[in-house]
């Protein structure tokens, strides 16, 4: 129902409408009807506020006050008073209505909103157009008692704001005279007397008040104000005077001023006062002191946040600077790299200073274990990613949630950086000493304060690349391929030793099982293979116990580990003299042989032979694809099984009762009944098995008794839909999978090797839960020797390959970049004498054992020919790109020269005319 049409008008709506129409009579009538001018709407705005801030509403303001609105009304949401709303209107009438004398009501004319008093607000918004109205408003406020000396957040008084309005010409002198006529005006105490200097410069004819002398003593507040004013010359003078006054004090008083210096330093950094910063820093104050508030940034963090690269550069050169691990300087600056440089500040320059500084850890992590590379990827800053990677950012740092920084990184950025890690020694490609240098600085974390025996999971980033469909092609990059070669070179001892022992165990337990169940007369041979089987079982138990101790939580999450536990259990039952009957023992032996063979196939598939790993991968992928597809289509198998059971599952006795033929002999009858029971679907389980057999095309249709047209129809549907369509579909999926695997055989081989190495490394590291095993120095040293490449094997985190000398791999023996002396952070130079070897050939992981790589891949110290060929291709591509870039630069310079000559020619023609 519309109450407005019935004469019931909402007083509040009438009040708003009257103000919009500037109808004072309806406005007063609405107030008389009970409307509230102070009532706020959904936007937290009242009619009273609108009247105060709208020019020409003097009568409306008086009406509101007469009906109960307060002259000191405050909007609680905005903390804004009525006087500030009236000043925003810049209407003298509105302001006069509010300041009208009312007994008992004193307006607070100096109340601030947004750090501005009404006088400051009027002066700050002064223009040529509103100068007369602003003059009248200021006169009203000053006559009412407003102070002309209250400053805003920049320590500007109202008169100072007026003097700074250089574009305002009309009425400016009258406004200044209005302030000068005020008896309490102070033009000397704020901003070091800048108001007096401006008055003398702009209006020298005006008579100024006498200069106020505040005394010779200068305090911290004075220095703070001078810093904010930007007069660094004056600050240097005042600070020198301030220090002179402090020299007469006690030592404890001098120490007490260190915190005050810290505040001055922070202020100089925030405002970019470099001269003041150097002056304060020259006092020798402790730059590592923390402020009083715990969450407040220190000096270096302040310089990074405000982009003051000059102060940051000065602080990083301080020998006494100590950076705490929780500084997170790079993380703080990366989020601000998109901000444009302003007034000398540049977050980009700060970022470059930090990544090039020896004092800043490029892999520093915050509380969530997020490293700077995480933030560069998060903010999609490609330039920051490239610079971090170039300076050795580790790509395998895991966050608190187990994610890696390269998770959302564009693959092309990572590939481009990997290309830059493949360089040469500068010799000609045909020379004998031509070297391909491969740098692994992003694959091996450089720990500053970690112990030498700390184990690292170096396979984590490569395992992630292998799992990512967008990045797994990078496994064929020479950087990753060569790294996998080195890791396999270290871990191959464990793999081949495990493979050898398990092969002996497989042969022993299968031979022992055959001899045992065939009751061979070779008792000694049976006992010998039984002993070998027990030794193999003992080895498996020891191996699985070590894995469980190292990683008890994750152990049972692996299907392979569960299968190995089942294998150990069944092997024990097979080898021991149990009280089981013969049939149970045979079943246990059968399952034991199956599990032993499956485990052996998995080990064979992990061999570094491309043909073997490809075929094992095809077997695994086709099996997984078949299981997934058949699980979905199994509903049709069950459906047809039930149909056949219902149609053909008549009992043999029922068929015989209907048959007039005599019964066969008893033995033949039982065999025939069993055969007919399977072929005639007499039991549900047998019906399911028979249906699965028929799915392969083995129908045995002659033994099926078709009794009606419907039985023929159901059987025909099964043949068409299941045998022809579904079975060929499954075959097609298998063929498709094998074709894909063959097309990516080399990539799949790299994935298999990555998975094997990652699994072995995870077992050895134990994910940090290895307990007393890794606490043992000897065990930890052995694991580190077999597993970790850096720092005990590659101190320089790079290798050299000789493509013209049999692809030999050389290991640098010295570190010119990372092994620095403590004095002046200088470099430790490589020895130049030819008698001192700088590099060595790749050697076996354990000197007592031969290199296991040579069993299948040739000599130990030789890199794969495919890897070397790809590395040379990368170098050729980089050289070609560099040549194209240089040619483009030459073309650009030629075009600029042509343009310059044409401009000269045109100018010459114009001059002749």
Swiss-Prot record:
Source domain of life:
Eukaryota
Gene Ontology CC terms: calcium channel complex; membrane; plasma membrane; transmembrane transporter complex
The record's region (Disordered) falls at 656-675
Q: Name the UniProt key words of this record, in alphabetical order.
A: ANK repeat, Ion channel, Ion transport, Membrane, Repeat, Sensory transduction, Transmembrane, Transmembrane helix, Transport
Q: Which SUPFAM superfamilies match?
A: Ankyrin repeat
Return the PROSITE patterns for the record: ANK_REP_REGION
Q: State which tissues express it.
A: Present in multidendritic neurons, chordotonal neurons, a subset of cells in the central nervous system and a subset of sensory neurons in the antennal-maxillary complex. Not detected in gonads and dorsal vessels (at protein level). Expressed in peripheral neurons that extend multiple branched dendrites beneath the larval epidermis, similar to vertebrate pain receptors.
Where this protein primarily resides, as one coarse class? membrane
| Gene Ontology terms for molecular function | calcium channel activity; calcium-activated cation channel activity; monoatomic ion channel activity; transmembrane transporter activity
One family from Pfam that matches here is: Ion_trans
Repeat positions for ANK: 154-189, 260-289, 368-397
Q: Name one GO biological process term.
A: detection of temperature stimulus involved in thermoception
Q: Which residues lie on this side of the membrane: Cytoplasmic?
A: 1-490, 545-555, 608-628, 730-913
- Stretches assigned to the Extracellular side: 512-523, 577-586, 650-708
Provide the protein's localization: Membrane
Give the family, as the similarity comment puts it.
Belongs to the transient receptor (TC 1.A.4) family.
The free-text function statement in the UniProt record for this protein reads: Receptor-activated non-selective cation channel involved in detection of pain sensation due to high temperature. Involved in heat nociception by being activated by noxious temperature of 38 degrees Celsius.
This protein is called Transient receptor potential cation channel protein painless
- Whichever gene encodes this chain, its name is pain
